[in-house]
Structures are given as C-alpha cells and as structure tokens.
C-alpha cells in the first residue's frame, strides 16, 4: 500500500462549524505524520464560514460536476471556483496530491455518527468497512439520484463523508467535536493495521441504500402545509412500515406511508434540505459481502 496523504475537509458548508473546531484542535495536538500517512487539512468554504452561511452562490458539495453540459471553468459561482481550486491543489494530479478525501459534516437531523458513501467504488467500501468495524457506524449509500450529483469526495480516488448530528447550525457542541476527534485520531491507525495485515474486514457490510426523498405537504401556492409527524421526529434509521405516520398538516390530517416495502428514513427534517424540497430521504437496508477486491484496490492507492 502506498497511501501517503489524506485530505481532511471541514466547513464544506460554512455553517457547519464543529468539524472546523475539531480539525484545528487536532492539528495543534497531533503530529502531521503517523504510520507514514500525512493529513492535509483545509476549510472547504472559508468565505461561507466567515459569513456563517451554508454557501455563497451554490452548494459546494454539489459543485464537483463533470459532464458535457457543465463547464467548470466558465461558471462564475464562487463554489465552482473553489471546487476547481481544491481539485487543482489536492486532487490526485494536483500540486499537493491526496489519494483519499474525508469530508466532515454536521446535520440538524438526529443521524448520530454515520458514514455517507456515493456509489459503489471498492476503495470506498474498504474504508467504510474499516470504520464500521471499528465504531459500528451506520452507512448511508447515496446513489440512484440524478438530481443530487457533484459531491466533493467523488473527485478523489477514495473518499467518505462523516456526518454527525443532531446539532444546530453555527452552534458549537463539545460532544460533537469529540466524536470528530475520535474518528480523525483513529483513521490512520485502522489503515495501518490493514496495511500490516493486523485486522481483516468484517465478513458483511450493512448499508442503507438511498431510494428517494419526500417533500413536505404543500398547499396550492406551494407553501409548506405540514410538519414532520411527532412520532417520526428524531427517528432516523428507524424502520417505517405501511400505515406509519409521516406528516401532520395544519388541518390535523395525518399523511401515512403507503408503500408495501419496509423503509428506513434518514435526514429527517434536515433544515438545509428545505430548499431542495426534501423533508426526509428513505432507504432500503442491504447486507453486502466483503470482497478481497476491496482491499486489493485500496492497496493500490
């Protein structure tokens, strides 16, 4: 294995301030090189962080797009320019190349500490399996959603999001900060153990696979006309079956789940997703058998 540099990104969203505090604290107290692996730290969206807002022109974590109809160089949005800078600096062909990107986020939803993956790259599965085995973290595998693309970690050969909540935007929570510190502190140790064949991946990886999202109930003007049902609040990762309540509108009407399949909701009531018309996303649970190819590809980084 030749993994040498890991990019740790905090503040991809400027009002998610706990990861920034955690990274600054870790950088003061820890050596930059351990097990032959060096961390590179960066605030993803420094201007938004200074202003205390999620972004300036566009969501930075949707700005790493590659398509024939999307020209990164001609877009005037600040976040597009920032995405180009991050890739030029820290991308695999950048001036300070990193093989792995870890993007640290907080959420107002009651997600606990979780891992977010985008797609089914073997290297990502390997890294996610290491962390799930160490900490027992749930994994949200985000795929099949063409309206949500351009995620930061997809611009690197390997990458994951660490998502922790619930915590309000622009509010420091020492418990949240400590969780980030534990994961950052342990990441290189787990990679080193794998490199030295001191640990193996678990036989199975449990993931919650994205199936879609649902908006709040709305009136004829398009305004929100319903709230998350009291029985659904703070129930991320908890199974929903047919007939379970989802929303309660202003007339007292209960909106129930009418699907035949069990689903597991995530990001329930996430404040930042209102603009995306998402009240919650829903997933199916999938058990994936670990593969030797995961480790083999990770070794090639």
Swiss-Prot record:
UniProt-listed Enzyme Commission number(s): 3.5.1.15
Entries under SUPFAM superfamilies matching the protein: Zn-dependent exopeptidases
Keywords noted in UniProt: Hydrolase, Metal-binding, Zinc
Catalysed reactions, semicolon-separated: an N-acyl-L-aspartate + H2O = a carboxylate + L-aspartate
Any Gene Ontology CC annotation: cytosol
Example GO molecular function: zinc ion binding
Residue positions binding substrate: 54, 61-62, 163, 273
KW Hydrolase (keyword) present: yes
Entry's cofactor comment: Binds 1 zinc ion per subunit.
Residues that coordinate or bind Zn(2+): 13, 16, 105
Record-stated family: Belongs to the AspA/AstE family. Aspartoacylase subfamily.
The protein, known as: Probable aspartoacylase
Organism annotation: Prochlorococcus marinus (strain MIT 9312)
Taxonomic path: Bacteria, Bacillati, Cyanobacteriota, Cyanophyceae, Synechococcales
